[in-house]
């Protein structure tokens, strides 16, 4: 009788241990499926292109940090569409996950000028691949030989710091000019009788922000007529 009771206790203990499981449990607790996610954390587009993404488990409003560069449209409860607007980089912050967005130019007519505002000549010289025509104390003039529309890039320095850039376009290349402006710049709310005014898509508080003005009538430069575009940083005059 005592043996029967003893074996009964052993069987009870074995059953209890099996039901409780242990380190070798074949069915561990699964992590929560409520974590916020986005189907693509690095989006690369050209201006005007779109990309669809799926966002799960995020109840707040979804927006792009800089809506001048890209925007996001809600299609349904999970699907969204990112639209490239202007050349630049921005992001979508979903708190626990981030989506980086890079918008590239749609039209590639020439190499961008160097925009190292406030820097000296050496930064520009190390960047430029164009033909250096003149090197003066307050300016560097480069000739563009690999573009159908741009002829010269003229860097201007104030107190040895890059403050503005003049770009000289061929006057018969208005389509290319407009494509370039559309890729890169926002139209300004201000007006000027002599210039069409634009600005970079960055916030005006950003030290890299700059203004853009396009002369409405051709200007004479090096004995030829051109359309003048001036980029200028308000922090360096």
Predicted regions and their residues:
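Short Gly/Thr-rich strand-loop-strand
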Residues: 187-208
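C-terminal motif of bacterial Sec signal peptides marking the signal peptidase cleavage site
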Residues: 16-19
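Solvent-exposed beta-strand/loop surfaces of large extracellular or lumenal domains
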Residues: 71-73
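Short helix/turn-capping signatures at newly exposed starts of structured segments
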Residues: 24-54, 60, 67-68, 77-187, ...
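Sec-dependent N-terminal signal peptides
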Residues: 6-11
């Amino acid at each position: 009788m005592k043996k029967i009771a003893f074996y009964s206790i052993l069987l009870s203990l074995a059953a209890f241990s099996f039901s409780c499981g242990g380190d070798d449990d074949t069915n561990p607790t699964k992590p929560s499926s409520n974590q916020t996610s986005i189907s693509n954390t690095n989006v690369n587009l050209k201006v005007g292109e779109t990309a669809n993404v799926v966002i799960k488990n995020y109840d707040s409003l979804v927006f792009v940090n800089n809506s001048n560069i890209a925007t996001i449209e809600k299609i349904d409860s999970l699907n969204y569409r990112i639209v490239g607007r202007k050349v630049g980089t921005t992001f979508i912050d979903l708190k626990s996950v981030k989506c980086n967005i890079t918008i590239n130019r749609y039209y590639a007519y020439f190499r961008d000028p160097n925009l190292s505002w406030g820097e000296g000549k050496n930064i520009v010289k190390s960047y430029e691949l164009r033909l250096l025509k003149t090197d003066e104390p307050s300016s560097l003039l480069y000739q563009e030989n690999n573009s159908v529309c741009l002829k010269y890039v003229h860097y201007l320095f104030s107190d040895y710091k890059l403050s503005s850039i003049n770009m000289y376009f061929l006057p018969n290349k208005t389509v290319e000019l407009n494509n370039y402006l559309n890729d890169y710049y926002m139209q300004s709310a201000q007006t000027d009788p002599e210039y069409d005014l634009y600005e970079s898509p960055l916030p005006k508080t950003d030290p890299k922000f700059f203004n853009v003005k396009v002369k409405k009538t051709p200007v004479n430069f090096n004995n030829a007529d051109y359309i003048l575009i001036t980029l200028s940083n308000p922090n360096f005059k």
